[in-house]
Amino acid sequence: MMGQQTKVLKQFDNNGDGRLDASERKPAREFLQKERAAGGGRRGFGPREGPGGPGGRGGTKQEAPKPGAKLGPTDVKSFPDAPLYDTKTLRTFFLEFESQDWEKELADFHNTDVEVPVKLTVDGKTYLDVGVHYRGMSSYMAVGEGSKRSLNLALDFAHKDQNIGGYRTLNMLNAHEDPTYLRPLLFLDIAREYLPAAKANFARVVINGESWGIYDNVQQFNKDFVKEWFGTTQGARWKVRGNPGGQGRLTYLGDDPAAYKGIYTIKTKDDPKVWASFIKLCKVLNETPADKLEQALDPLLDIDGALRFIALDNALINNDGYWIRTSDYSIYQDVKGRFHVLPGDVNETFVKPGGPGFGGGGRGGGPGGFGPPMMLAPQMMSQGDKDADQKLTKAEFSALADVWFDKLDADKAGKLNQEQFTEKFADILPAPEGFGPPGGGRGFGPGRFVGPGFFATVDTDKDGSLTRSELKGAFEKWSSDWDSQKSGSLNEEMLRTGLSAALPPPNFGGPGGRGGQGGGRGPRGPGGATMPQVKGVELDPLVAANDPNKPLISKLLAVPALRARYLGYVREIADKWLDWKKLGPVAERYHALIANDVKADTRKLDSTDDFEKGLTQDIQGSGMGPFGGGSMGLKQFADQRRAYLLNYSEVKK
């Protein structure tokens, strides 16, 4: 998820109808392009440009994207009587954009308040003026033009009652970081046994007559969702957007709603009374003694649901979850005033711990992962490529070192320590929307967590200071070492690959540790020392039990009865749902349903070989998980995680 949108709709909506037609979108695009070219946009660093996807996670190399098969409504089977999210159905969605330039148009309007209209045909029925935008953050920025990006479809964009099977918003997800496509479906299947969670199945998407292959079709958290689970469309909803430096901790920040509004995005009416009740929840959670917490909190929070929520996150290792990032989840306050904490994006599940917010994984993050290489490589290319040929020569790379050092050494002292370097590095690697804290300031931008590792790498004499000659020497050495083709220059992929090997994992740090007396240290949140590694899938079920920055875990698990109940849920999930005898047949059925389409998919982010292996074999890379350039087989994860949890001393009780 991205942060606050860039608002341009009102500025270019000349006829005041609340949306932009083609004639209005043209100047809006030109405006955004100029803003971003001048550095006035809000994206900081953008997606990969040009043809080609992220290159996979270190398994079989992804082929360059190319046009898919031509398909029309008469070429596929219709399912007019099947529910929209029927998991046995592979339904086809035909999108017709007004322009063949639709990819660039969606990219121009990414993270703005503008929808691009399409004609949508499903099961032989046509829906007009459906609004479409690219969704996601890492799943967008790590994917180049021509490869599959996630889509959000608003059926009610222009016609308020328009829906498919009672659903007004669709999310077509690109299976970023998941070569199997199965992870969201499996996680949500299990989650719905414990708490309100989205429905999901697979969809075949055809755009302007060309197949774009298989997407995960995941239900939107909106009024339709609330109606299904709670029997009403009333109540308040919040989205805690995905952010590697997530601040959606449910900590008490005082009584002023302004302190919360930059973190928790309210999706319903911005009512002061609603905010007051939310702030009360945070205050009670954080400031009530453990022996009084359950009684005080029960009227405000579905405590049992919260325990199930954190148990699912941990047992199934959700690398986008509250336990690691304190973001990318949803909150609902029902009509009785009680709050419910619900899952958000779950594509990075059934994996080894890693990714933004964690110290595990590979070195600097796989070339296609959302890590320092993906952040740095586009900036290096855009800032150093003076002749605009999409390559960096050794001379250009060396000149870039001079430009960077001039910016970093503002005081002209001739050298920088790590603190000075990191502080100024934010000017070289600006924060995109969603990274900075509310109220401005650099805060937790990419420069903050990439800077220390970058400094350590280019400080070649390891004396704790960086000189111009050291920076130039490092860049010139990289230019030679990473030029695998001996062409005299580096393209962006070479930069990413080289940076992935050269840089250490980012430092997120912070208070942490497992719970219990004498417990060892666990993964840490933003703000402190480097986090320890976790062996394989051995993520402690009591991780963050002593972390004050994760009160939904630490405060609830400080109550012995709640701790025991939580561990009971962990035990049940491991014993029942991670048993491959139960999980395997479901995964195999899903795999078989989409296998032929995935093989034929010319826009997918991973190879067919990785798709086939991912069910029962590890896909090897420089490491495992989103930052490590590999992917763990689903069966391997289930077997190993189940064995570890069922043998964990407090889970066995």
Enumerate the language-model features and the residues they cover.
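Phosphate/dinucleotide-binding and metal-coordinating scaffold of catalytic cores
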Residues: M1-V8, K26-Q383, T393-A395, A399-K407, ...
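Acidic carboxylate motifs that coordinate Ca2+ or other divalent cations, activating on Asp/Glu
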Residues: D13-D17, D21, D320, D385-K391, ...
